[in-house]
Amino acid sequence: MNRLMTFDKYRVFETEFAGRPLKVETGKMTQLANGACLVHYGDTTVHVAVTASEKPREGVDFFPLSVDYEEKMYAVGKIPGSYLKREGRPSEKAILTSRVIDRPIRPLFDKSMRNDVSIVCTVMSVDPDCQPEIVAMIGASIAISISDVPWNGPISGCSVGMIDGEYIINPTEEQRKVSQMATTVASTSSRIAMIEAGANCVSDDDMYNAIMAGHEANQKIISFIEEIKAEIGKPKFEFASLEPDHDMFEAIKAFAEEDVKVALDTDDKRVRDERLKPIYEAVHAKFDEIYPESEALIDECLYKTQKFIVRRWLLDEQKRVDGRGMDDIRPLASEVGVIPRVHGSGMFTRGQTQVLTIATLGPVSDKQLLDGIDGETEKRYIHHYNFPSYSVGETKPSRGPGRREIGHGALAERALVPVIPSVEEFPYALRLVSEVLSSNGSTSPGSICGSTLALMDAGVPIKAPVAGISCGLITEGDRWMTMVDIQGLEDFFGDMDFKVAGTHDGITAIQMDLKISGLTPEMVKEALAKTHKARNYILDEVMLKAIAEPREELSKYAPKMFTTTIPADKISEVIGKSGKVIKEIQAECEVKVDIEEDGELGQVFVSGIDSDKCKRAIEIINTIAVDPEPGAMYLGKVTRIMDFGAFVEIAPGKEGLVHISQLDVKRTENVTDVVNVGDIIRVKVMEIDDKGRLNLSRRQVLIDVDGLVPENDIDAERAARPRRPHNDRRGGYNRNNRK
């Protein structure tokens, strides 16, 4: 007998968030996952599933969490454009969103847990006014909270915009277009768990107030999730901790602590690593027999010993491993013009962290075209970040950019977007590539500084120079302390990496990574103040001394760019049938021509190596787009020679006759004495007859522009001169006085 399925555990929970309905469905879909939910915000719908392995993964010294944010093209009613017609590898935006969701969630898991946990957020429909990234973060928090996976959440997230000084929670699509910032804030019930921001040079106070507005808004959703958890949440499962036991750690710490202190007390990463090698060997020689089959745990104890020492130095003595004060920056160096023939280059060094950035200018058509669930978008400015293994002294094969590289590149890109000139001000596409040459912490802020140097070296008229700096944090109970410009060891053993980029006047980007549950408002405010002071120091004392302002001229190896505007209804004439006309222009002038329609106008971009050829292409295009008028001058190409004159094409499809009498200021016997087929000459439109035929003159150009005098005028001038008397021989040859 057939039976109808019933979903006894199906539940629907509803609330309102920033003036729009938020609905959560559970118990109907994805019943084999540890936890799952379907979240609707407006018409945006995201499905989230959480699964965990039953047993811990062996041989790892970290918590194996993966977060995947998946964009489905059906969510916006599109079929993927690839050959396979299905979604492929995640987009850059999807990877960045996965990282944003991961960052506030990860610290709330027990660090000793080794069970694999997977969180998959699938975007199923998109309402442009309700960002799916925020819905996915909320959905992930709900799914973990109601699952049996141990977690110390919940968290909530929101987007904060600012328009005319007013803070807007989860701004609509139109509001996001005019907002002075795009800030994502995640919170627990008491602390700020994550900040990701891009801003148009806003003040520290504006950014702080936006963060606090987001933190306050998140509290309503956190309470909402707590209610859901209380009603349908599962009991949390027990897991086996793979952390070394207390006695083992204390024994190894007692044996190695003093030697480790000596090893750590240096500002040279290589020296530190060399000092630590014999300590590891000595510890293993003593404890491998005591704790057989526990080599990984012995290494973990040594790692924890280093962490214990560094944190004690910072909290109790305000001592950093390299001897700096808490607000001191490592030695700095800036250099431009490092690499020949490239369009621009800048190298920024901070201690043992060194980043070389190369700037490349290209025609506007080199912009990146993106087609995702946000619709078709364009990126004229692109930043890529590379972190090769040699930068940390390791030998690993290059596998292409990973999530970390994509995330760091996006931060540097976002930091400079507000100062990049508009396409009208600087009609180029821009690509920056930051190569990390050596790394001892804070490479992404270094790539921001290197990018500013490279842009200025390339002659890009940026609105203001941008610098980046990181701020670290050490906490213990109610005690906490911040430090500026953290190096690798302080990043590994500290609680925070708070990266801020900005100009002298304001913030352009923030990225905050935490290893603790969150920050208090006081911690956020202090981090903003310290990074502002530090980036001003970097700009004034180092970067602007290397190059004070963008170069006035572009590199001779950069393409020359010229623009013009034509009526939109003339674009088809410039392109021609099957692109015939525009191809001829590009071939003849050795240039690249790009046209973008903007309402009633067409913006034309011409790029090439030779400025004169670019100008020639612009002139041809303008001639096509504007009907010739009597008195106008054009540069044309001789296409045919006749006995009575030469035909000259001033633009594709626009040809006129230069009569033989109008070829030169002097009498011309043969047309070929003056011009031949293929010659480029400047002509003036003398007349357009009733049939639209053009009568052109080279002779008149020579008179009007070059100031030449026609031959018949010279004859007339000679004829008008008074003649000397026939017998006046002054100054002449006197036959009677011949010698």
Task: Please place each PLM-identified region on the residue numbering.
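Extended amphipathic alpha-helical scaffolds
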Residues: 2-53, 240-375, 559-573, 581, ...
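Short, hydrophobic beta-strand segments
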Residues: 121, 193-198, 239-243, 254-264, ...
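Flexible, glycine/charged-enriched surface loops at secondary-structure junctions
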Residues: 111-117, 152-154, 221-239, 270-271, ...
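Mobile "lid/hinge" segments at catalytic clefts and subdomain interfaces of large enzymes
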Residues: 148-264, 455-552
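Long, basic N-terminal domains or extensions that often function
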Residues: 2-240
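Conserved phosphate/anionic-ligand binding catalytic regions in large, soluble enzymes, centered on
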Residues: 35-37, 130-148, 336-359, 440-460, ...
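Glycine-rich, flexible beta-strand/loop modules in the N-terminal catalytic cores of phosphate-handling
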Residues: 33-118, 123-125, 130, 196, ...
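Single-stranded RNA-binding regions, centering on S1/OB-family and related RNA-binding modules
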Residues: 557-559, 563-739
